[in-house]
Amino acid sequence: MPVIALDRDRIRSIKVEYNLTEHCNYGCDQCSHLSPYMAKRESSLESFKRDLAALSEVIRFYRFRFVGGEPLLNRELLAHITAVRASGIAEEIQVCTNGALLDRTPEEVFAAIDTLTISWYPDPHCDQAKIDRAIEICRRVGTKVGVLKIDKFRRMQVARPIEDKSLVKDIYDTCEIAHTWYCQTFYEGRFYLCSRPLFTGPYLSKIGIEAPDFRALDGIPLHEPRLKERLAEALRSKKPLAACRYCLGTVGRNEPWRQLPAAERKAPPRPASSLAEMLDRRRLRFRKLLPLPPLRSLLLFAPQGAIGRAAAMFSTSLKRD
């Protein structure tokens, strides 16, 4: 479970992320948000503001992270950033991008955020010139920037539910996405420990498999009484999500990065690999032996006014994710 701190009025956590789009201009195989298979959809600014207002009453984060899909595809990106800044819900705002649209991004977007993270894949749509331009603008406006070269993804999605309950629990307990990287999110009135409940159902439906409504099963309603207590309980829960039965967390085997062809995105085949072939047992054993909270969790126990200064100690880690 992610490390959190409780004040009298609010929960304190490290990070929350928000999917500005479900679709993407890339089609990465093994995308953790299953973006190649999602319909074109941008965040509703009205729904976002409503959920943001509810959350800001009960929780504070060090960082608010915009993801996707590809967040630079959202035409109201700047309005979303402005809403987060006005809410006071986080000390820093981050945008994570594949970099392909950096040359079209207005300078005011770079200036409005605190950190830009570029996931640089071996694809010609993002080149050194685009990255150099982004770095130069970020330096000029005082925004931190991190460039991560990525040439492999881990297997995550399985087509059939994992029946071994102890294995599901082990995968959940060792999941860095939920517990170490603080990839909590919210969407249309519900809060989630990670994004898998949002996207697993639509993917399974696309390959012809009927699945439960993970969005309802795994989401915490944001507009009902006792939100602070219910959020704290969910964040401290040791029980796997319903969607965890269809996920390998961060212990799937690595696969070389590749772009899926359009035909495969439109009509994806069911995965042919067995669970044994997809699961990295060695990594699972290692993660079980090393269930340590991330160093950035120490930020939660710094005095409120010192959090920003203390965060500089962990800037490399925070730029990474």
What is the predicted function of each stretch?
Residues 1-36, 218-223, 236-240, 250-251, ...:
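N-terminal pre-core extensions flanking Radical SAM catalytic domains
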Residues 24, 28-31, 175, 183, ...:
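Disulfide-bonded cysteines in secreted/extracellular proteins and peptides
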Residues 1-95, 101-104, 267, 274-279:
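Conserved alpha-helical substructure of the radical SAM core
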Residues 12-17, 158-164, 225-236:
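Short, intrinsically disordered, charge-biased short linear motifs at domain edges
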Residues 40-44, 254-263:
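Short cysteine/histidine-rich zinc-coordinating motifs and their immediately flanking basic loops
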Residues 74-197, 202:
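Conserved AdoMet/S-adenosylmethionine-binding subsite of the radical SAM
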Residues 140-155, 196-254:
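C-terminal accessory region of radical SAM enzymes
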Residues 31, 35-39, 182, 201, ...:
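Cys/His-rich zinc-coordinating "finger/knuckle" motifs
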